[in-house]
Amino acid sequence: MAVPKKRTSTSKKRIRKNIWKRKGYWVALKAFSLAKSLSTGNSKSFFVRQTKINK
């Protein structure tokens, strides 16, 4: 099993953590955008079946 030779510096740790957070931010933004387009009916990639409620 691979063992690190030296301890990772705080700055490098912080940089990696920020990259990880940034990726999560963009994924969440894209998901929110898709949900918004689905709710308004402007989505071109999903077909949503419209159901009408009879009263």
Curated annotation (Swiss-Prot):
It comes from Solanum lycopersicum. This is Large ribosomal subunit protein bL32c. One of its GO terms (biological process) is translation. The lineage of its organism: Eukaryota, Viridiplantae, Streptophyta, Embryophyta, Tracheophyta. InterPro entries: Ribosomal_bL32 (IPR002677), Ribosomal_bL32_plant/cyanobact (IPR044958), Ribosomal_zn-bd (IPR011332). Belongs to the bacterial ribosomal protein bL32 family. Its main location: plastid. GO terms for molecular function: structural constituent of ribosome. The keyword RNA-binding does not apply. It is found in: Plastid, Chloroplast. Keywords: Chloroplast, Plastid, Ribonucleoprotein, Ribosomal protein. It comes from the Eukaryota.
